[in-house]
A protein has these predicted regions:
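Short coil/turn connectors at secondary-structure junctions
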Residues: 8-10, 58-59, 81-82, 109-112, ...
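Residue-level signal for inorganic ion chemistry
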Residues: 45, 101, 120, 163, ...
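A residue-level structural signature of the nucleotidyltransferase/glycosyltransferase Rossmann-like core
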Residues: 62, 114, 212-213, 285, ...
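A short acidic, often aromatic-flanked loop/helix-cap motif at beta-alpha or helix-coil junctions
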Residues: 91-96, 155-157, 194-195, 284-285
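Conserved N-terminal catalytic core of the sugar/cofactor nucleotidyltransferase
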Residues: 1-14, 22-32, 37-118, 122-130, ...
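Left-handed beta-helix
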Residues: 1-9, 217-376
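Conserved core of the sugar-phosphate nucleotidyltransferase
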Residues: 126-254, 276
Length: 376
C-alpha cells in the first residue's frame, strides 16, 4: 500500500467551462469570469494553475473548458500542453466533466490520483491550501477514499451547500501524521436558509462544500460504475481515444449532447459511503456575483468599493466598476445606496445588490433579443 502519492502520478483537472453570467456585463461567453483579472493582474484561471504547479507538473494539469473559451484559455496558459486543454461540445454539468477528466487521467496513468478543482475560487493562503491538497493526494493514493475539501464556515452563508462531518479519522498504520485533519463525511446537505445555516455554523460539525475533490482513477471509476453506469461506460469509451485529440474531439461531439446532465454531488458524492472530508483550514471565497467583490476591495468611509474614477455625494455601500478600455471618464453618483454599477465599452449595468442573482435572468433576455445577443 502506498504511503504517499508520487509526483508523476498526481494530476489536476481544472473545470473552467462556466459562463459567469452573474458578472455580466464584464463576463461574456468568450471571456467569462474565470478568464478575467478582477482582483489583480492574473485571471482566476491563471491563479488556479499557479496554486497547483508546486505540487503537480504542468504536463499533468488538464483544463476542461468549452469551444468558445478555448482560444483565450490557450493564450492565458502557454505552459500547459495544448492537448491538455479540452473543450466540452456542450455543458452537461459537473459529473460529465469529472468523467471526461477521469478518462484523460486514466489514459496517462491508471495508477494516477487526481484533484478536481474549480477555476474561479479565491484562495489567498496558498501555502495552507497546498498543504491540504498534498495531504489529500496522499490519503487518496493510499486506499479507496473519495476526498473532498470542506471549508470551515466563517458565517452562516446560504449560498453554499454544506457537509456534515463525523468523527475525526486516525492516521493509518505506517503513514506519517498529516497537518490536515480528516473526517468521515456523514451527509451532504443543500443550500440552507439563514436559521439552519446558523445552526450548522454554531455546531462546528459542518463544512462548506467547495466543490474540490481528490481521488484515484480506480476509486472514481469504481464509484461511477456502481452509481452511474452510463457515465462509467462513457468513461471507458473516452479513455480509449483520450490520447488522440482529434479522435477525442470527434467522439465527444457525437456523444456529449446525449450525456445525462447531473452534478457530481448528486451523481456520486451523496451516494458514496467512502467519502472523507479534508478540513480546509485556509481563507477561501467563491465569487458568485458582483456583491462578493466587496469582500476583497478596499471600501471608502461610506462603504463604497470602486474600481473607477469615482466621485459621489450621499452614496453608500455601492460597488462601482469601470471596465472601459478607452474614453474612460469619471463616474459621478448622487444618493445611490446598496447598488452595483458596472460600465464596459458597450454596456452599462445598474442593479440593486439584493437583486444580483437576477443578472442571470437579464443575460437570458439579452440572448433572446436579436439586436442585443451580441452583448452576451
Amino acid at each position: 500500500m502506498k504511503t504517499q502519492s508520487d509526483l508523476k502520478d498526481r494530476f489536476v483537472i481544472i473545470m473552467a467551462g462556466g459562463r459567469g453570467e452573474r458578472f455580466w456585463p464584464l463576463s461574456r461567453e468568450k471571456m467569462p469570469k474565470q478568464l478575467l483579472a478582477l482582483l489583480g493582474k492574473k485571471s482566476f484561471l491563471q491563479e488556479a494553475v499557479d496554486r497547483v504547479l508546486p505540487l503537480v507538473p504542468a504536463k499533468n494539469i488538464f483544463i476542461i473548458t468549452n469551444a468558445a473559451q478555448l482560444p483565450e484559455v490557450r493564450k492565458q496558459l502557454p505552459k500547459i500542453p495544448k492537448q491538455n486543454l479540452v473543450a466540452e461540445p456542450i455543458g452537461r454539468d459537473t459529473c460529465a466533466a469529472v468523467t471526461l477528466g477521469a478518462a484523460l487521467v486514466g489514459a496517462r496513468s491508471t495508477t494516477g490520483v487526481m484533484a478536481v478543482l474549480p477555476a474561479d475560487h479565491v484562495i489567498p493562503e496558498e501555502k495552507k491550501f497546498q498543504q491540504v491538497l498534498s495531504d489529500a493526494f496522499d490519503l487518496a493514493a493510499r486506499g479507496q477514499a473519495i476526498v473532498t475539501i470542506g471549508i470551515k464556515p466563517t458565517e452562516p452563508a446560504t449560498g453554499y451547500g454544506y457537509i456534515h462531518v463525523g468523527q475525526e479519522l486516525p492516521t493509518p498504520p505506517g503513514a506519517k501524521k498529516t497537518k490536515t485533519t480528516f473526517f468521515k463525511a456523514e451527509r451532504f446537505v443543500e443550500k440552507p436558509n439563514y436559521e439552519t445555516a446558523l445552526e450548522y455554523v454554531n455546531s462546528g460539525q459542518y463544512r462548506w462544500n467547495a466543490g474540490m475533490f481528490v481521488w484515484s482513477f480506480i476509486t472514481v471509476t469504481n464509484g461511477l460504475e456502481k452509481h452511474q453506469p452510463e457515465m462509467f461506460a462513457a468513461c471507458q469509451r473516452w479513455f480509449k481515444v483520450a490520447n488522440n485529440p482529434a479522435k477525442l474531439a470527434k467522439t465527444l461531439a457525437k456523444e456529449y449532447p446525449e450525456i445525462k446532465k447531473v452534478s457530481i454531488d448528486y451523481a456520486l458524492m451523496e451516494k458514496a459511503q467512502n467519502v472523507v472530508v479534508a478540513d480546509g483550514a485556509f481563507e477561501w471565497d467563491d465569487l458568485g456575483a458582483w456583491p462578493a467583490l466587496s469582500r476583497h476591495l478596499k471600501a471608502d468611509a461610506e462603504g463604497n468599493c470602486a474600481v473607477a474614477d469615482f466621485i459621489h455625494v450621499d452614496a453608500a455601500r455601492n460597488i462601482i466598476f469601470d471596465a472601459r478600455t478607452k474614453n474612460r471618464t469619471p463616474i459621478a453618483v448622487v444618493g445611490l445606496r446598496d447598488s452595483i454599477l458596472v460600465q464596459t465599452d458597450d454596456a452599462v449595468l445598474l442593479a440593486h445588490k439584493s437583486q444580483a442573482q437576477k443578472i442571470k435572468e437579464l443575460v437570458k433576455k439579452l440572448a433572446a433579443d436579436p439586436k442585443l445577443k451580441k452583448l452576451v
